[in-house]
């Protein structure tokens, strides 16, 4: 997001994200690291994972898995956008992108003078963008504000999203990332 | 659950809508101008636009649902390549349902495509490139320009898809091409006294254009006859419905001719002056008597007729009336001759209404009424569509109805009708050399009927690289789908641009996300109404989707033609606007449309386009049709002859596959577009087989059970729907469903890709099947519970087998 910056030190961030298993409120860095992990895998992420795990991560298979799960094409994708899980007219359908919840999220960002970075062509209610915004709130605003945002937005759909992703039988990295993300969002429940 | 209300609470009801002028453009040919309401940068609502030519205000349910096409989560979002594909090791066998893709950058995607084109040309020659574009959109893309510059092969509708009816009509009138022939424009139809809609459900599948004009004519006193095997939305509007058996259309038209001959209801003046009815035909070889045998200096377009006043033959040019015998036989200089009309009457005499009633499943009195109305009530016409040509020898119907209308003199008068979706000639763009650029390498064209051989057998050249757009060819109207899939495995690289991941993009190696129409600036022409439309961009393409123009321009740049594609598409459109005195940006921007020439037009007022300038009710230069169920030496078509393949009662496998299988066009889709719109899928939930309860109960099939529709080519599993509106012996599944919508198999697998020698047209409805209750595993409600309904989708995939 701009003007807030993403944590570019992905190696540190990823390590932090996966190592932070405590019960306390997640740090801004943890939100930021999760956000980085939810983006299209890039060389930084691959390097970070290589540095922190014993096995070498095959960058192409990670990208293919990300594409399969979150970009499509095809029926096994789980579009990582809030409105898709909240604004559909019937439970059986995926909802639209750019629904009313997308607008609500965008309004949160603009309240704080933020908007998704120009390089992000995805709708503003992408899970990664919401996590980046959570990182910003964690760092710059009070706990109640963060709580309100998490309750109004990511917590409202991350379970539905997670169910759909799990149905698509994700590979370990994304299965873990999903668990950590769900857990992180729940943990932040504890007042700071 | 507060999540339902949270969204509503934040929707702003303040602020102003921006109304963006744009237009729809699938292949219903409607090209309806639309108003798109945009608020906070997002599209909120779509309405019909009142265009400059106001009486042509149009729009349908599909157009109103674009919101769910633009914001569909299932859209193609980024350029992608199949992970198992690489230029050096394309692994075409890895395509299909299990193929994995990875997102790539646009620059990389365009590099791969351009390099692939260069490489194929270099290694296999320019004709190893195959360009394919269907009818999915009508905007300015630069596709044709780039293709002409780069060269290669292109496939085309001609011949192959829906080229029968027009072809037969053209053969005897010299007018039109292979598609619907010219007709009086729709605003003249109100003058018709009798309208016969023949094999077309225009109140369901093209209602945005033609239906209102038909109703106007009815209100003005016209009799409406509908010939259709199915009790359709259109049939229910009819004064007389002829529920014909499939494939018997030529029989019916001949029976009408027989009635008209018997009752002397033919238009003598028209036949003498504008047809070759009086032309003298040699009895020995069926050719026309040579004018040079009658006069030393015959006029170029002259025919020999018999003048009953002088008692001798004479040569007359086109558009000439006189005391010419319409019937009779003479011996002239030892040669026995008769008139062309004599031969036609002789042919019609074998098809009296009483006999045809039996063959075609009709009442003789109804046939006579239809013929009587057409011949005696005043000007009228026949409005067929492509459906009636979807039989192997369907072109004969084109010849037949052209001939029938010649008998009744229904050409060149107010109130005559010859086709649906009439042409207004004014909606064109002054494109200059845009589609025919300097330095063009040129492309060779192959009809779809030849492309399967081209791909499968390298006959006559082996194609290696295919670029496709605006088309879901593997989802719709390409029969024997398995053969296409096999044939395409000979291609090293398949590149496809689309808005959605269709059953066709699934077979691609490189997928390019195209912009939705509302995300483009464009100029749209049409022939179905006298308006030219401007598309204003409602917002930028979502994700990384691109207007096809910019895809073409990106490729052009890499292929050495960058200077021929302006960086900004607007500059191209600007060129067309500046070329054209009728157009101005102010008007286009403000109103969205410019009215073009909307004068009602009467067609066929001049000499016909045949050699003689006359309709050849006797075609002395007739082709000999060859194909299944015809005699080995073929059938020569001087006069209309009912030819049938699989619809014939004595077809070799009629006992094994007793049911005829049709794939009607649906009101819920235009071909396969809109199949993924949730609002529409709420109503039109899944593919079904329309089957008469008699046929179903005979097979132990309950209403709503899943059935396997099968023949020796393939099968498809769909839900049976008891339908009293479909005649026993005929079943129907609407076309345009996507592979994933079928429980198992695919509609296209059942249809033969075989074409006849003359017709050269896929015969979608010339198909026989048997229907049995599907296996128990398909009877559970699991399918419907997980029915994809458009945007989601985890159902069994029709591609997996």
Swiss-Prot record, chain A:
Cell division in keyword set: no
Inducing factors: By anaerobic conditions. Its expression is under the control of DmsR.
Entry keyword Chaperone: yes
Keywords, comma-separated and alphabetical: Chaperone
Disruption phenotype: Cells lacking this gene fail to grow under anaerobic conditions using either DMSO or TMAO as terminal electron acceptors.
InterPro entries assigned: DMSO/NO3_reduct_chaperone (IPR020945), TorD-like_sf (IPR036411), TorD/DmsD_chaperones (IPR050289)
SUPFAM superfamilies named among the record's database cross-references: TorD-like (SSF89155)
Function (record text): May be involved in the biogenesis/assembly of dimethyl sulfoxide (DMSO) reductase.
Family per record: Belongs to the TorD/DmsD family.
Protein name from the UniProt record: Putative dimethyl sulfoxide reductase chaperone
